[in-house]
């Protein structure tokens, strides 16, 4: 008997090993004993040729879980076995006309919010100016969000305008001795006390500096905010250091981050726009435009396009599992867990993470494929024959809602770590250390969201609810896979995905 997934974690320096897939009982799908190297001991994954997937020794053998469709998403149909090549000039002309209808879909999403200054969160997007709007700087007069450095202090637009009008028009307000409290909702009730508050906090007509906060002033204020937080809770410095570590690991593990994907979708990148696939003709043209890393949808003309693309998605899924496992190894405490528990956490967590990160590649109109080289429209995916046309719609519905939370990569880095360290997975041997790690991650996530999204007080609770939503998406995906298992006799599942599905639930 060959080694198991657990053996893969024992010696990270050893060579990739072979896993023996034994014949199953008569109640299950019969499988020929096949040795297939697919999960190296460094917790990565070596590639498997597509030809191996055609071997029916790897036919569907799944428990209730899900295959994955990461960034090379697609499952087209149209009963198409080989396609004749269209005339390139005619095809290009038709594509350009049709593209005008779809090009706007790539630029409708707002850019993902920028990261915090390194002074505050210990990490930031390289060479990118952090936005004042995300710094949680309050107006010194009323406590509303400051829009900048106005008349010598950080002030909101309302108080800036009020002070300017008072000074320019030389307004004199009726005296009030009540020392009224000035805050966002009451600032217009007593103009005298509001003006006195402006003067008290240091607003002056001699300091007529408008607009953005000077960099030195900004860094000073951010350092003060960070220091205040650390004094209130000494553990927060450790939590922010953990957030920085996870973010750094995330950037190293996942080549196509949300920031990069959003730049492509919003047209903010200097690279050429992705090739839009909206029908079968444009899919054929994509053969020449897109550099497919593993498999082109048209490389095997003897198979239906839907099946060929589905197999390509499986290759991307294997890559995604490799990226996630490498990231998991960098979560503090993960590699010290029981070896079997490490495997269990990954088996159950990878798909939920894949769908989380898939949302970064989506907008309401389509999804980026092939590392951002292509953009496949939602309508095209929905038009595919059943059951393939049903696969992606739940993911789009989730993505639209999830993207509305406006998380950035620094938020996602902690969130996916929380998903991995879920102590309620079936079959765990030692739950306590897993829950201890997750508790620490949850504290880091809560602090991160307070710093990065000060205006969204319920964001932490909303994000935890998404973990439940992800499990439901996985369940629905499995139900579709069970349909394919029965109806698509030519379909096969990648051996690594078989190993992940085996003995789940």
Swiss-Prot record:
Cited Gene3D superfamilies: Erythroid Transcription Factor GATA-1, subunit A, Retinoid X Receptor
Look up keyword Chaperone and say if it applies. no
Major localization class: nucleus
Q: What is this protein called?
A: Peroxisome proliferator-activated receptor gamma
Q: How does it assemble?
A: Interacts with FOXO1 (acetylated form). Heterodimer with other nuclear receptors, such as RXRA. The heterodimer with the retinoic acid receptor RXRA is called adipocyte-specific transcription factor ARF6. Interacts with NCOA6 coactivator, leading to a strong increase in transcription of target genes. Interacts with coactivator PPARBP, leading to a mild increase in transcription of target genes. Interacts with NOCA7 in a ligand-inducible manner. Interacts with NCOA1 and NCOA2 LXXLL motifs. Interacts with ASXL1, ASXL2, DNTTIP2, FAM120B, MAP2K1/MEK1, NR0B2, PDPK1, PRDM16, PRMT2 and TGFB1I1.
Molecular function terms, GO-annotated: chromatin binding; DNA binding; DNA-binding transcription factor activity; DNA-binding transcription repressor activity, RNA polymerase II-specific; E-box binding; nuclear receptor activity; RNA polymerase II cis-regulatory region sequence-specific DNA binding; transcription cis-regulatory region binding
Source taxon at top rank: Eukaryota
> Residue ranges of the NR LBD domain?
238-503
Tissues in which the protein is found: Highest expression in adipose tissue. Lower in spleen and lung. Also detected in ovary, mammary gland and small intestine.
Q: Name one GO biological process term.
A: rhythmic process
**Reported modifications of this chain:** Phosphorylated at basal conditions and dephosphorylated when treated with the ligand. May be dephosphorylated by PPP5C. The phosphorylated form may be inactive and dephosphorylation induces adipogenic activity.
Keywords recorded for this protein, A-Z:
Activator, Biological rhythms, Cytoplasm, DNA-binding, Isopeptide bond, Metal-binding, Nucleus, Phosphoprotein, Receptor, Transcription, Transcription regulation, Ubl conjugation, Zinc, Zinc-finger
* Coiled-coil intervals: none
> What's in the GO CC field?
cytoplasm; nucleus
Residues spanned by motif 9aaTAD: 495-503
């Amino acid at each position: 008997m060959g080694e198991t997934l657990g053996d893969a974690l024992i010696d990270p320096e050893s060579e990739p090993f072979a896993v023996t897939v034994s014949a199953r009982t008569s109640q299950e799908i019969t499988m020929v004993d096949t040795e297939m190297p697919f999960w190296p001991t460094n917790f990565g994954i070596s590639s498997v040729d597509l030809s191996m997937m055609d071997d029916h020794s790897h036919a569907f053998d799944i428990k209730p879980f899900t295959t994955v469709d990461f960034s090379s998403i697609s499952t087209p149909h149209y009963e198409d076995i080989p396609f004749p090549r269209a005339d390139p000039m005619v095809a290009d002309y038709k594509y350009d006309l049709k593209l005008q209808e779809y090009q706007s879909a790539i630029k409708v999403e707002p850019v993902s919010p920028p990261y915090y200054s390194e002074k505050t969160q210990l990490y930031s997007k390289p060479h990118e100016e952090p936005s004042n709007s995300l710094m949680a700087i309050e107006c010194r007069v009323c406590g509303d969000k400051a829009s900048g450095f106005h008349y010598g202090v950080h002030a909101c637009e309302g108080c800036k305008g009020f002070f300017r009008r008072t000074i320019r028009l030389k307004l004199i307000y009726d005296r009030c001795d009540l020392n009224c409290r000035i805050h966002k909702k009451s600032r217009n009730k007593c103009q005298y006390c509001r003006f006195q508050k402006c003067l008290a906090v240091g607003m002056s007509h001699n300091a007529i500096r408008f607009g953005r906060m000077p960099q030195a002033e900004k860094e000073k204020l951010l350092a003060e905010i960070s220091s205040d937080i650390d004094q209130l809770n000494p553990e927060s410095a450790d939590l922010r250091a953990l957030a920085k570590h996870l973010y750094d690991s995330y950037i190293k593990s996942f080549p196509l981050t949300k920031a990069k994907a959003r730049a492509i979708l919003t047209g903010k990148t200097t690279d050429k726009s992705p090739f839009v696939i909206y029908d079968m003709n444009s899919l054929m043209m994509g053969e020449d435009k897109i550099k497919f890393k593993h498999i082109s949808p048209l490389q095997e003309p003897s198979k239906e396009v839907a099946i060929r693309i589905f197999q390509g998605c499986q290759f991307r899924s294997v890559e995604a599992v490799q990226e996630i496992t490498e990231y998991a190894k960098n979560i503090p405490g993960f590699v010290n867990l029981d070896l079997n528990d490490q495997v269990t956490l990954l088996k159950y967590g990878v798909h939920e993470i894949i769908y989380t990160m898939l949302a970064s590649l989506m907008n309401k109109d389509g999804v980026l494929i092939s590392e951002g080289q292509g953009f496949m429209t939602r309508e095209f995916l929905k038009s595919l024959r059943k059951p393939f046309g049903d696969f992606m719609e739940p993911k789009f519905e989730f993505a639209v809602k999830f993207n509305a939370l406006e998380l950035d990569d620094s938020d996602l880095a902690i969130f996916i770590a929380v998903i991995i360290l879920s102590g309620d997975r079936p079959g765990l041997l030692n739950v306590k250390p897993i829950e201890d790690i997750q508790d620490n991650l949850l504290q880091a996530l809560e602090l991160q969201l307070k710093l990065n999204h000060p205006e969204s007080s319920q964001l932490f609770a909303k994000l935890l609810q998404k973990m439940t939503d992800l499990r439901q998406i996985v369940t629905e995906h499995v139900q579709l896979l069970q349909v394919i298992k029965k109806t698509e006799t030519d379909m096969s599942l990648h051996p690594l995905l078989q190993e992940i599905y085996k003995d789940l639930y």
